[in-house]
Amino acid sequence: MRGERLAIVFCLLTLLLTGCKKQHSQDAGLEQCNSVYFWRTDLKLDSTEKAFLSQYHIKKVYCRYFDVVMNDDATEPSPNATISFSDTLPTGVEIIPTIYITEDCMHKPHKNLAKKIVDRVLQMNKTNDINHVQEIQIDCDYTSRSRKNYYQFLEEIRHHLSPITYQLSTTIRLHQLSMPAPPVDYGVLMVYNTGDPRKWQERNPILDYRDVYPYLSQLDKYPLPLATAYPVYQWIRNIQNVRVEHTVEAEEILKVKKAMEKERPSLSRSIITYHIETDNINRYKPETYEEIYRH
């Protein structure tokens, strides 16, 4: 009888240690830091934005370099809306070139697309004297239709980055948590654009806890290291000649953050806000940003 009890205790301890090991392996190599997205077409920071970087100890800026969209005759992907660099980031703040790719670009393979993107990023860094880059991020709302081609494309990106030892990351939407993890070093979980824009009178399309809730149970078992990105922006649009403004209340952001970190505590390690802009900075109180960036 005593032997049976000891065996049960041993099994329970093994399960506990296995669970801890899994949690540790999810987060291996993920730096604890505060970051922002920069999503404008000219890298130029005003005094409020520079003060924000300093006040909240921002270490990384995920900077959109350009989009990749299908060309006019829908035959080949091509770059669009390339950023200009009128300013530089403060010393000690790392820039992460980020490329947004429309999902239709991944409906079929495109020869040399990965090489063209890597070469273009490296050339932009060289032309604009941007040094000490260590990573590229790819942003794509891939679906079950485009996933296979997208993952192969990411493998090709990794191949072309390997000689310069860059890391590769990608964005992860909530609906993508049910798919196999992409072949990257880590993902950024986009905790925004969670709702149906057509149902804006019922729920906030930027972020609503009710839209996040169904995905909470998938967080802990997702194998890829994850940073999290929260919305601080406003979405203004015209619906039937009526100006509609979508803004997420601070309480809703923090409610979602708390629920996600309850399921996977390590999501507090690397926090990003989307996106840095003076209006967005002034939209929320300093204590709200302190809570968003709390580790």
Question: Which functions belong to the PLM regions below?
Answer:
Residues 2-14, 159-167:
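Short, basic, low-complexity termini and linkers enriched in Ser/Thr/Gly/Pro
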Residues 17-19:
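C-terminal motif of bacterial Sec signal peptides marking the signal peptidase cleavage site
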Residues 21-23:
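Bacterial signal peptide processing site
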Residues 27-39, 67-190:
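Chitinase-like catalytic core of GlcNAc-active glycosidases
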Residues 44-70, 127-129:
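Catalytic domains of carbohydrate-active enzymes, especially glycoside hydrolases
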Residues 61, 138, 187, 228, ...:
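Conserved, mostly hydrophobic/aromatic
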Residues 148, 152-239:
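Substrate-binding surface in catalytic domains of secreted glycosidases
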Residues 233-235, 239-295:
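Substrate-binding cleft of secreted/luminal carbohydrate-active enzymes
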